[in-house]
Amino acid sequence: MKKLKILILIILFNLVTFKSIQACDLLSVEIGENASTLGFLSSFEEEDIDPNDSVTIFESQTTAFCQDIDFGSTLVKGYLTMDGIIGAVEIVVQNNRNNRASEQGLLRNFVKANFGDFNINSEEWPGYKIWNIGPKQIFYYYSERENEPTKEGVAVTNEQYYNVLLVNEYEN
């Protein structure tokens, strides 16, 4: 009977762990670690990194990182330093002129539910919000310009590597 209880606990633990592996958990991204530690970046080759650029950006379908959440029309980007280190991971909404993807609010609602509330319709909305959670930074941005697609996304990085999001500003 005791062995059966232990077996059930092991099975439950594995189910919970497997679900969290599939979850879209930005805080689980190991910023500063080798790219091979992150699923959708694990298949890149060293020769894929441009030695002339301080940052190489890899893009993939968001489902490669977030298997259990539908954000609509989005991409996931991995920002790697020239030595193959993860500097940031970003989920970007792919809007067209009518901004249908952002109007659905799928990414915005995910960010609010996981990191905190904000109001993009406020007169004081600066266009972004940053949360410092432990050693990591979550950066959400949303900006509208007339006659242009809305820019919306969320990224995880840290103080040491946040400049990779500025691509040309990163210094090792």
List where the protein language model places each region:
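Cys/His-rich metal-coordination motifs, chiefly Zn-binding "fingers/knuckles"
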Residues: 1
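Sec-dependent N-terminal signal peptides
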Residues: 4-16
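Short beta-strand-initiation
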Residues: 8, 73-75, 126
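Sterically constrained small-residue positions within well-ordered secondary structures
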Residues: 14, 69, 82, 121-122
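Bacterial Sec-dependent signal peptides at the C-terminal "C-region" and cleavage site
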Residues: 15-23
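Non-cytosolic coordination micro-motifs
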Residues: 22-62, 88-172
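Compositionally biased P/S/T/G-rich terminal and signal peptide-adjacent segments
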Residues: 61-83
